[in-house]
Amino acid sequence: MTVHFPFQNSYAALPDNFFARVAPTPVAAPRLIKLNRPLAAELGLNPAELETAEGAEILAGKTVPEGAEPIAMAYAGHQFGHFVPQLGDGRAVLLGEVVDKNGVRRDIQLKGSGPTPFSRRGDGRAALGPVLREYIVSEAMAALGIPTTRSLAAVVTGEQVYRGIALPGAVLTRVATSHIRVGTFQYFAARQDVEAVRRLADHVISRHYPDLAGTERPYHALLDAVIARQAKLIADWLLVGFIHGVMNTDNTSVSGETIDYGPCAFMDGYDPKQVFSSIDEFGRYAFANQPRIALWNLTRLAECLLPLFGDDKDQAIKEAEAALDGFAAQFTDAHQAGLRRKLGLFTQVEGDQPLAQALFDAMAAVKADFTLTFRRLSDAAGSGDDAPVRALFEDPTGLDEWLPRWRQRLADEPQTAAERAAAMRQVNPAFIPRNHRIEAVITAAVENDDYAPFEELHAVLARPYDDQPAFSAYAEPPQPDERVLQTFCGT
């Protein structure tokens, strides 16, 4: 059975300075451990073909499928605020692009596929643990309804990688609407290659924002569009307690998808200053700082686009600043609208923002569990029973002051209690990929070659808004000895 990929590649048709042509490095004994069958079908691929030995070889990079044009993409980036003029795909290869069943062009990329010209002394490989983490979290984000790259497959390579100790090697097949980043623009801007910036901008407009192609000022409109998508994306993150952990400009997608899950984590107890990433020692990418960092990253994109705005540099700067000034309102509108939905408020009145903030203050005072607080408020909205949500607060004084204000506000809404509770359950998940659960899954796979815990967690997270009583343990926060205090970059 020949594995068929209906490749229609566009990025590989750009000039050679946009990438390096490099094939994945073959591995010893690839074995498929997970295939995302629904995603495969959505991409126009045959899952049965991918589950063959030949399919595993392709997904591990041992065999290059017909029609692929493997490349490592060039990009630069600000890493923790420090500019690095050349980064690029150091352990990933873009096999090519397919047009999915909805007419959307999607990249198919192998992560952990071996060294490239951008590897910078690295081995280009990935360990099994980070591959499983990205698979779990990216698919959980998709199930939550948050724009994200996707995971098509995970394959073990039959080889070991060395990260202080020997670990099983693995390859993740990542799917994205594109892998073009703010750092991709920075790569060419740093080289003062205005024509390449223009070519890249035209490609992004054609691929992601085709409605802008015929507008009078397409590059201004492109900046506006990327700002709008990032504002909505960061609001989505905050509404589920997600901390990206490494919001460098090379990890900021111009398509508005969450990309690069390295040290990401979901909060358990609410703390706006929460940091998990082991390398974020000063809290640059802390939970509540993410909107500010997104704007900082977008400002770097605007700097790259300035030469396309016109010959009058001062005027171009004013126009870029005006666009960037719109980010705060767009983020706030999206975030506040999301918070109203989470609180069961379907109309907007003055005082809603202070009401939400008062709840966060009460949660922060005792580090109440972020996810369960909102889920149990959903139940309380229907039943009138506040005891389950109060049980999450070691000292419920702040919550007890807040609950009457909330109920008084709910009385102004037209919905019945049952309607309100049902709507709240659709935006307040019961299940998130909690750090201690991910670590348990990784331990079972790495130490015992046991993927049953991975399969079970993945299945539960595919239905985050359903109660799933048989799996209620997955909704619980960690015990003190289960808490994960730090996460690490991996893939």
Swiss-Prot record:
Keywords: ATP-binding, Magnesium, Manganese, Metal-binding, Nucleotide-binding, Nucleotidyltransferase, Transferase. Pfam families: SelO. It catalyses: L-seryl-[protein] + ATP = 3-O-(5'-adenylyl)-L-seryl-[protein] + diphosphate; L-threonyl-[protein] + ATP = 3-O-(5'-adenylyl)-L-threonyl-[protein] + diphosphate; L-tyrosyl-[protein] + ATP = O-(5'-adenylyl)-L-tyrosyl-[protein] + diphosphate; L-histidyl-[protein] + UTP = N(tele)-(5'-uridylyl)-L-histidyl-[protein] + diphosphate. Its EC number is 2.7.7.-, 2.7.7.108. NCBIfam families: PRK00029.1. Belongs to the SELO family. This is Protein nucleotidyltransferase YdiU. It comes from Bradyrhizobium sp. (strain BTAi1 / ATCC BAA-1182).
